[in-house]
Amino acid sequence: PLPGGGRTTLNAPLNAPLNGRTTLNSPAYPAPQQGYGPRPVKFPEPGATLTSARGSYQVLRTLGSGNFGAVYECIGPFDQTYAVKMVRPANRPYAEVQAEWAKEVQRLQSLRHPNVVYIYDAFEDGGLFYLALERCDHPLAAMLGTPMQEGLIIELARQTLAAVQFLYDNDVVHDDIHAGNVLITHTDRPQVKIADFGISTELYGMAAVRPNVVHHAIMAPEILASGYTSRQSDLYQTGLVMFHMLVGSPALDTSAPYEELARQIAEGTPRMRAEAIRTPLGHVVAKMLRRREAYRFGSAREVWAELRELDAWKQRSLFPVK
């Protein structure tokens, strides 16, 4: 989960529903333990067994939990380890939760790419909906806190941008790129996997669409000002992730109230802070964080074309294994 920031609907009062969702800050938002209206459901605990047509999954532990879902480490068919995501009912109608689950399943099955998390199975058990995904080592968020080496930043950005470009080419906007949804697996070098397509949006040939919901701290200026998202919105969010890697702290105080975050986003604070770094990499990040989409990079390919020319990339050393 993103530290400090809830999610908000767009162009609506902060407690108003949009496409079946409400804000996490709203008193109207149900507690995550609730089921489908008055119908309670039992969430899995360590030791529980989940059953699919393809086999069973034994729950080992909870990897992460939020208001819209929880992820469990499980041992599945052939004793392989999986990250099994549960879609939380959150007091919504059964059909709505089923539709959300089916949308994410379809999206992941259609988006096969080395830098997109792989889905192996999808099933319903005990009235709850699950996705069995490849198990990665940890989210990028676990690596943050101090500035990273620029060569490593560019390598992680390269893979993230490859995923973002793949989404662009398939008319999909992720809408939720942050360090918790950028997963890392370590082999001889870090492998990036973009996860959580629960609120992703298909453009259907359009330049921009109204998103379902967005985290306060990663709102692109166009979402805040006009309530729409576009391909450049994902680039803006990727720029925020790169800033965090470069500086060791986020561009915005994620614990700040919504009104303060909105003011800083509207004023271009993230871009100004990136410019203040005064390095070639900082300038690339600053361009990704410009307030107007037309002044950002036109695509993830354009970002990479600049990154690959930086000395930090050309002179990079071997990447750490852990």
Predicted regions and their residues:
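Conserved N-lobe ATP-binding subsite of Hanks-type protein kinase domains
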Residues: 70
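Activation-segment/catalytic-loop signature of the eukaryotic protein kinase fold
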Residues: 122
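Activation segment signature within eukaryotic-like protein kinase domains
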Residues: 156-157
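Catalytic-loop of the protein kinase fold
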Residues: 168-185
